């Protein structure tokens, strides 16, 4: 085991001579290979003992099941992870899934900085470098991934470590082809072997941490919490204002958990009146009420073995809260109109934009249920508190909108600056709506300042709220955006170019706002 106090010494020793010694020992191990799993485990031991590569992992891809499985994992005695070989990755999922999908090496100076890092093994030091390289099979198709922690903390040493691991990966891949791949693949090069190049996109990609954008301290902390809580069945309470992405958090937790292959069922507790809520969630028997012509399973039964996301839990009634508490405590329920007790195995992720502590104090929310739900709270900050993420979010959303519209879109630096001056009371949802509206207005494919329109007229960006002429006293700061524009037009004699100068805008921006805000221009 390599202690952190020895890390500086070990880094200095990792030179060409040490690499050669490690490579020689690995070649001996591979030349004597008789059993794949045992051989790969011995290779990882050499990487750990002689090449100072911690927590080495070798994953192999099964194209029939479309999964990447851990074949060998180097662990220390005090970090043994039971069932590690049962952990699976889909192509494009996490760091190793990305390497498999792209067929290219991945080097991270600090592993936790990458949003695709899932940490399902709970072995890795978040502050250490991470290197993952593909194992290339016949016809340049990846058949697996070799990954490890590099003890070389200095970034300038990482390229040498990467080249060393790529060489080791080539040796491993050759051995795997001889031991695992069927001989028919070698005899028929035109046929696809059992292990094929994976598809670049899979349905799970929309739910991974790579879909969570932001490098602010608050978002880094949230991503770390998601990695940790995903491994367990702990009940999670996601809190935050409307539009902050609470459902996205729930999706990420489920799809990176051991329950990922099971159902993820969503339900909005405020969407139905109380008399229909219980039937929708718990199901009903035939004849339970007028219109119940057949038995129907509820959301809890549909989510059995998986995850149930209860949005707006703070809006639920007292009777529903009592039944939910029973399920959380005992895992039991009955359908409406039935007397058969059903057992369900469901993980609950709840979300609310309410201050539940105050609701408990007022008697609107059960205190015992509050403590049952609040086992692992995740508080999402509003967008105005992480303005450093707005630029990255905007570029991400523009790419998403461009894909949905089937065209090329770009956003200018000026538009980004304007977005960063707005306080976004509707949070990320409002930002996405704003950019989608701007994309529709952008005929050239460039989203610039002149096509950016905001929803909240009482919360204009600084570019419109503050301008030189306002000091003359003619522009009342209490006016909303439409009223400001009309005031400027009246001041300018309804000449759009003059009004634009008064507001610090371009004539095109003024023209767009006149059209969108339905301002009638007098005939001069």
Swiss-Prot record:
<feature type="binding site">
    <location>
        <begin position="303"/>
        <end position="312"/>
    </location>
    <ligand>
        <name>ATP</name>
    </ligand>
</feature>
<keyword id="KW-0238">DNA-binding</keyword>
<protein>
    <recommendedName>
        <fullName>Nif-specific regulatory protein</fullName>
    </recommendedName>
</protein>
<dbReference type="InterPro" id="IPR002078">
    <property type="entry name" value="Sigma_54_int"/>
</dbReference>
<keyword id="KW-0067">ATP-binding</keyword>
<dbReference type="InterPro" id="IPR025944">
    <property type="entry name" value="Sigma_54_int_dom_CS"/>
</dbReference>
<comment type="subunit">
    <text>Interacts with sigma-54.</text>
</comment>
<feature type="region of interest" description="A domain">
    <location>
        <begin position="1"/>
        <end position="182"/>
    </location>
</feature>
<dbReference type="InterPro" id="IPR025943">
    <property type="entry name" value="Sigma_54_int_dom_ATP-bd_2"/>
</dbReference>
<keyword id="KW-0535">Nitrogen fixation</keyword>
<dbReference type="InterPro" id="IPR009057">
    <property type="entry name" value="Homeodomain-like_sf"/>
</dbReference>
<feature type="region of interest" description="C-terminal DNA-binding domain">
    <location>
        <begin position="482"/>
        <end position="524"/>
    </location>
</feature>
<dbReference type="InterPro" id="IPR027417">
    <property type="entry name" value="P-loop_NTPase"/>
</dbReference>
<feature type="binding site">
    <location>
        <begin position="240"/>
        <end position="247"/>
    </location>
    <ligand>
        <name>ATP</name>
    </ligand>
</feature>
<keyword id="KW-0547">Nucleotide-binding</keyword>
<dbReference type="GO" id="GO:0005524">
    <property type="term" value="F:ATP binding"/>
</dbReference>
<keyword id="KW-0804">Transcription</keyword>
<dbReference type="InterPro" id="IPR003593">
    <property type="entry name" value="AAA+_ATPase"/>
</dbReference>
<dbReference type="Pfam" id="PF00158">
    <property type="entry name" value="Sigma54_activat"/>
</dbReference>
<keyword id="KW-0805">Transcription regulation</keyword>
<dbReference type="InterPro" id="IPR029016">
    <property type="entry name" value="GAF-like_dom_sf"/>
</dbReference>
<dbReference type="InterPro" id="IPR025662">
    <property type="entry name" value="Sigma_54_int_dom_ATP-bd_1"/>
</dbReference>
<dbReference type="Pfam" id="PF01590">
    <property type="entry name" value="GAF"/>
</dbReference>
<keyword id="KW-0902">Two-component regulatory system</keyword>
<dbReference type="InterPro" id="IPR002197">
    <property type="entry name" value="HTH_Fis"/>
</dbReference>
<dbReference type="GO" id="GO:0003700">
    <property type="term" value="F:DNA-binding transcription factor activity"/>
</dbReference>
<feature type="domain" description="Sigma-54 factor interaction">
    <location>
        <begin position="212"/>
        <end position="481"/>
    </location>
</feature>
<dbReference type="GO" id="GO:0043565">
    <property type="term" value="F:sequence-specific DNA binding"/>
</dbReference>
<feature type="domain" description="GAF">
    <location>
        <begin position="35"/>
        <end position="176"/>
    </location>
</feature>
<dbReference type="GO" id="GO:0009399">
    <property type="term" value="P:nitrogen fixation"/>
</dbReference>
<dbReference type="InterPro" id="IPR010113">
    <property type="entry name" value="Nif-specific_regulatory_prot"/>
</dbReference>
<dbReference type="GO" id="GO:0000160">
    <property type="term" value="P:phosphorelay signal transduction system"/>
</dbReference>
<dbReference type="Pfam" id="PF02954">
    <property type="entry name" value="HTH_8"/>
</dbReference>
<feature type="DNA-binding region" description="H-T-H motif">
    <location>
        <begin position="496"/>
        <end position="515"/>
    </location>
</feature>
<keyword id="KW-0010">Activator</keyword>
<comment type="function">
    <text>Required for activation of most nif operons, which are directly involved in nitrogen fixation.</text>
</comment>
<dbReference type="GO" id="GO:0016887">
    <property type="term" value="F:ATP hydrolysis activity"/>
</dbReference>
<dbReference type="InterPro" id="IPR003018">
    <property type="entry name" value="GAF"/>
</dbReference>
